[in-house]
Amino acid sequence: MSFTMARYSSSSSSASSSSCGCCRPCSRICSRSSAYTLALGLGFVTLGTSRILLLKFSGNEENKYDYLPASVNLMAEAIKLVFCLVMSVRVIIREGRSFKDLGCSSGASFLSYLKWSVPAFLYFLDNLIIFYVIAYLQPAMAVLFSNIVIFTTAFLFRVVLKRRLSWVQWASLIILFLSIVSLTTGNGDQHAMAVHGLHPAHISTPSNSCLKYTHLHQVHQSHNESYWSRELWDSQLIHKLNSFGLGYVLLLLQCFISALANIYNEKILKEGEQLVESIFIQNSKLYLFGLVFNSLTLLLHADYRNLTLHCGILYGHNVFSVALGFVTAALGLSVAFILKFRDNMFHVLTGQITTVVVTALSFFLFDFQPSMDFFMQAPVVLLSIFIYHSSKMKDPEYALQQERLRVINGEVFERSRGDGEELERLTKANTESESEEESF
């Protein structure tokens, strides 16, 4: 009996010591995960705010763009692709893997590769629409109205990812929608105004062939009656659409496209074997398609193609537009990390901080003069967002996925070796517990 007690005490002490040993790395991982989460959130808010401001500053006196918006997106996609390819090569060399992982060596891998074309095309549309949204609306109204992305994200969460929402969350979404509609029908100065005094010169001087082409193009347009009739019809149509609220229609379309792109991207980032795959290898495939789609815009449009061939891709660009390309690239990378190691709701929540920052800056930078309705309805928008996030419904499947991702969150940068043993052990343990419950 004494032998039994001694064995029990020794096993208990060893178990307690092992549990303490497990707690220490766990707490270290959790603190590291919190630090990475805070860094992701701050980076996303800073980059999101900078992007909105640069979009506004890069316009001309007529609140239009001297450069082609597609060229900015093409520049951003190229920067992201080069960065992810360099990091992917680093990961492959460290893990001793084959470079075939960056391509497609079979029919099945080719079909899997094509999955990344869907979010790439949606992001292409999203990044293109935002230029015209900022041209039609004040930045403060644009970011406030873009909160409707919470509604579209929640709807797609339920349909695509089968996520559950409580009745309180649905009620808060309805309040959010009605508040945003009330904001858009207010009497404040909601339409965009050009920023005076912040229009720097172009970074490149047009060549002789460029000047000759633009001059001939203007002469051709001035003698083309069909062009003027088409321009008159377009201006009348745009005026009618603007009075109808074209900026809000475009922003509503962008909210749906953005939510769909982020949800589909999160789905393929985390499904099956992709959960433990390097984010740089995954994003290399995504940004390759993004580069193709943005290149097609410049190639298929006759005016864009001729202007790019004669004047170059940097024609009309200024310091703000070039900075916009780098900020857009960094913002896209931060969104990818959020979708991989957090989720869409964290992405949407941090976006609300961007809303507050941009709205505050609009008072000082863009002469934003809101009506009394704005001050009454804006707090309701933020309050409904708070109610939505404070009344989350427990979803066992989502909690299980977050538990599996917790190890990756804590070792987001150390994980480049790609062993993934802890994740496999955790997955195996969860699978065994599920099978025991089913048998019971």
From Swiss-Prot:
Classify the source by domain of life: Eukaryota
UniProt record, GO biological process: transmembrane transport
Subcellular location field: Golgi apparatus membrane
Q: Which residues are glycosylated?
A: N224, N306
User: Where are stretches of biased composition, namely Low complexity?
Assistant: 9-19
Region annotation (Disordered) maps to: 1-22, 419-440
Enumerate the transmembrane spans.
35-55, 67-87, 105-125, 139-161, 165-185, 244-264, 279-299, 319-339, 346-366, 368-388
Q: What is this protein called?
A: UDP-sugar transporter protein SLC35A5
Organism expressing this protein natively? Danio rerio (Zebrafish)
